[in-house]
Structure formats: structure tokens, C-alpha cells
Design a protein with these regions (language model features):
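ATP/NTP phosphate-donor binding region
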Residues: 1-79, 89, 93, 97, ...
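Short hydrophobic segments within beta-strands
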Residues: 5, 106, 256-258
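Glycine-rich beta-strand-to-loop/alpha-helix junction loops that act as flexible
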Residues: 8, 82-84, 106-108
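Short glycine-/acidic-enriched loop or helix-start segments at secondary-structure transitions
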Residues: 15, 90-92, 115-116, 170, ...
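ATP/nucleoside-binding phosphotransfer catalytic cores, i.e., glycine-rich phosphate-binding loops
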Residues: 15, 214-216, 241-328
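Short acidic/glycine-rich loop or secondary-structure boundary segments that cap or lie
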Residues: 168-171, 220-222, 235-239, 263-267
Length: 328
């Protein structure tokens, strides 16, 4: 059974056209499916929660009847996400990760850091046929970002690509809140909005003293932090290759700290990251399962490019190994 969760507005409205193409393909193949088209924020997560909770209960009930034997495997239920990184992240935060379901992904967004990192085809026909004829799977890690909420309670958010504090979060926030972004999207000038966001973020960036604590043991201090990114995959912020040492499903985060006193060097570093260059001066990388990050100056934070617009000084990140079964 296939469950399609579609964001029709993803990719500046391209999501609906992509879904119509997919619908014609699966209709020709007489495939049984259910489709859920989102109409607003957080609806994708709500759909994912309902689908996966139902599948888990169904699986547990059937397994009990069959004396603990597995009644169905994850491959028999596939939840297909049609949207961008934001839609995927929303579904990740809504779904029951213990449900017997595999994930198919048709990337339609603008940044597409997840698809870029996994080297997924941008061709709709290619992706949907790979999902329908699923042969290759990969168990992906996901991360958890923890921050203090307004009421003092800890707030948790899952991420599949990256989470961070500082410049990378500021770039994401600027691009998402840019008034001309919808127009740039319709004109297929998404790179222009990304360029403006990066440029203005670098121009206004202020470094901070701070430190990271790795696995609760090793503390490393810095004098000029511009950003700290916890990477599960190589790319973030619409194609910036920050997490060069990030492994796919290795159970560890790649903590990338950019510390440099020169704003000119910062701009060069962002340009090199956007160009996929191998070496970035001032960028230090550490591997760990969990980390605490502190900066003396409050910075914006993000998870998978989604920033709430609130500045903070402390975040915690951790990695959950191999829980997302993905059709590659």
C-alpha cells in the first residue's frame, strides 16, 4: 500500500504539477494508494502521524494474533513524500518512527539538500519508478535538536539533514522571510534569493565566543564563532557543502564549527562552501553522538532550514541511528 503526502505549494507551486504526473503513472499501473494533499503548515506532519500510528497499531495487533510472528514488513507499506526538505522534515517530526513503513521521496523543493546529499534523481518519472520497483534501501539516521522553550520546558525537534546555530540559521531565516522569494521562484531565479540571503547574512554577522561539549566529555572553546552546524548529510542551506565528513547512517553527527575573526574570510568560506570546494579555512569538524553548543551572543537556530526566528545561546543535538528506512 502506498500513502502519498503531497505539498502542492512546494517548489513555488511545482508540487501540484508533479503530483498530477505521478497520479497518471500510478493510475496506468492500477496501484492501490491513498493521497493526502496539504493545505497549510503542519498538516503534512499530522497526516504522517495518523498514517504511521494506524500502521503500527495494525502491525502490533496482527502480530499478537499470529503469536508474535511478523505479519507485514516495512516494504509492504510505503509513505511517499512529494515536496521539499521542509515537507520531509515536517513529516519526520510527525511520524511514528517505530511504524512498519518505508519512505519514498520525490524532491520538489528549491534547496533540495536531502536529495542532493543522497544523489537522488530530480526526474519525477525516474524517482516514482524507483519507488514503485523498490530494490535499494538505506537506513538513515535522524537528529534531535533540544532547546529551552519560552515556558522553560525543553523543546525537541527532529532533523534529517542538519541543525545549527548562527550564520547558517540566519541565512535560512532571511531566505524564507524574503518578500521577493515567491516571485523569484516563479521566475526560476531561486539562486538569486539564496545569494541575497547569504550576502546580507555575511555582511551583518557578528562572531561570538563559545564552546562545544562532545559526548559529554570533551570541551572545545572558540573565540570567534560565526556558526556551528550539526550535520547528518553533506549539504545544507540550499547547496552549501559544510558537512564533508558527514556519514550516511553511521550513527554520528558531524559538528562543523566556523571560527574566524575576518568577515572577508567568512564571505570567502560561504562562497567556497556553495561552490562545493574541498577546503574551507576556519572550518573545524568533530564527530560525536551528541553535543552541547553554547555561544555568548544569542544566535538564531534552525533544524533542516526551519528557523522560528528566536535567538538563543544554547542548543543540544543528538543522533538516532538508522531509524528511517529510505528507498534510494
Amino acid at each position: 500500500m502506498y500513502y502519498f503526502i503531497v505539498n502542492p505549494n512546494s517548489g513555488s507551486g511545482r508540487g501540484l504539477r508533479v503530483w498530477q504526473t505521478i497520479e497518471r503513472i500510478i493510475a496506468r499501473k492500477h496501484i492501490e494508494y491513498e493521497a493526502y494533499l496539504t493545505e497549510g503548515p503542519e498538516q503534512a506532519g499530522a497526516y504522517a502521524a495518523a498514517i504511521t500510528e494506524s500502521l503500527r497499531k495494525q502491525y502490533e495487533s496482527t502480530a499478537e494474533e499470529e503469536s508474535g510472528e511478523k505479519a507485514e514488513t516495512a516494504e509492504e507499506h510505503v509513505m511517499v513524500i512529494v515536496g521539499g526538505d521542509g515537507t520531509f522534515s515536517e513529516i519526520l517530526n510527525g511520524m511514528d518512527t517505530d511504524a512498519p513503513v518505508a519512505i519514498g521521496y520525490v524532491p520538489v523543493g528549491v534547496g533540495n539538500d536531502l536529495a542532493r546529499s543522497l544523489r537522488l534523481s530530480r526526474s519525477v518519472n525516474s524517482r516514482i519508478h524507483r519507488i514503485l520497483r523498490a530494490k535499494k534501501y538505506r537506513n538513515l539516521d535522524y537528529g534531535i535538536m533540544t532547546v529551552d522553550g519560552a515556558d522553560g520546558e525543553a523543546c525537541h525537534r527532529r532533523f534529517i539533514v542538519s541543525s545549527g546555530i548562527g550564520l547558517d540559521a540566519d541565512i535560512c531565516h532571511r531566505e524564507d522571510s524574503m518578500m521577493l522569494k515567491p516571485l523569484f521562484g516563479k521566475l526560476r531565479l531561486d539562486r538569486l534569493s539564496r545569494f541575497f540571503a547569504r550576502y546580507h547574512s555575511c555582511r551583518s554577522a557578528v562572531p561570538s565566543k563559545g564552546y562545544i561539549v562532545l559526548n559529554g566529555e570533551r570541551r572545545v572553546e572558540f573565540n570567534n564563532i560565526f556558526f556551528v552546524s550539526a550535520m547528518l548529510l553533506p549539504y545544507e542551506c540550499g547547496g552549501m557543502k559544510i558537512g564533508r565528513e558527514a556519514g550516511l547512517g553511521n550513527g554520528e553527527l558531524s559538528i562543523c564549527v566556523y571560527s574566524n575573526s575576518s568577515r572577508t574570510e567568512l564571505m570567502n568560506a560561504i562562497r567556497r562552501a556553495a561552490g562545493g570546494r574541498r577546503k574551507i579555512r576556519g572550518l573545524r569538524t568533530y564527530s560525536c553522538k551528541e553535543a552541547k553548543i553554547h555561544t555568548e551572543i544569542p544566535f538564531l537556530v534552525h533544524a533542516d532550514g526551519e528557523s522560528g526566528g528566536n535567538a538563543m545561546t544554547d542548543i543540544q543535538v543528538s543522533c538516532v541511528k538508522g531509524k528511517i528506512r529510505m528507498i534510494i
